[in-house]
Amino acid sequence: FGLGCAAKWTGIYAGAGLAVLYLGVLWARRQQGRPGFWAEFRLAALGGVLFYVVLPLCIYVASYLPYWWRQPDFSLGDWWRCQLSMYSYHATLKATHPFESRWYTWLLGLRPVWYYRNGSLPYGMKASIAGMAGPVIWVVGLAALMGLFWHQVSGRGSRQGAAVLILYGTQLIPWMLVTRCTFLYHYFPSSMFCLAALALMLARMRHRDWARRLCAGLCAAAAVLFAVYYPALSGLPIPAWWADALEVLPSFGFY
């Protein structure tokens, strides 16, 4: 958690999901009515503060050690002003970008982020780099998430399914409230739970022949699509006809 926040503040969203799971486990134990719960709760609360607040904060502050090494007079006040400056930048950002996208387009990966184009290639060749969705994992995973949600609300859910939904939601829901310029890559942390949801749903059906065939088919489709789109992920030069064929939606536009 501390390392995640040190890399990017959106790691706080993951911390919120962990906190919900932590409190949920404590609540479940309280509902069991076992003796000695409050002693266990006090120990768990102390551990939660220590390992979810104090230790991550220390790790976050320690990530600024290069500042102190380079500039010995760098103070905690300077550190705090860095935090205020970063917050102010993101809170007041008014810039726009041709490849920005809203959160609801991320669910199906409708608007990739274009990073690079090589304009010095021979005629008939193209090279580009874009950040985009893995269509099998994202699209089928979204369906699996909806299936998990239905199982939970219909009383047939599991703790694993609830955990996946909570962690997915705490990564995505905050972005629904953001009005500034956002991009597809903000959904990447949430997309990991699409894969987890897909794994859970397939595990439920593992004893059915058609489910095993479906699993094999999805793996094969994901591998084929990765190979087909690898040039757009890596900048590998390819013939123009191949590049043009990769832009299956008007919103892609990365060649």
Where are these regions (language model features)?
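Membrane-interface alpha helices of multi-pass inner-membrane proteins
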Residues: 1-9, 19, 172
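Membrane-interface anchor segments at the N-terminal boundary of transmembrane helices
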Residues: 113-161
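Hydrophobic transmembrane alpha-helices of multi-pass, membrane-embedded glycosylation machinery
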Residues: 15-26, 189-192
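Hydrophobic/aromatic-rich transmembrane helices and adjacent perimembrane loops
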Residues: 13, 182-203
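Membrane-lumen/periplasm interface segments of specific transmembrane helices
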Residues: 28, 45-110, 114-116, 228, ...
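Membrane-interface catalytic loops of GT-C/OST-like multi-pass glycosylation enzymes that act
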Residues: 176-188, 232-237
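Membrane-interface helix-loop-helix junctions at transmembrane boundaries of multi-pass membrane enzymes
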Residues: 29-47, 144-165
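Transmembrane helical bundles and short interhelical boundary loops of multi-pass, membrane-embedded
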Residues: 20-21, 26-27, 34-52, 56, ...
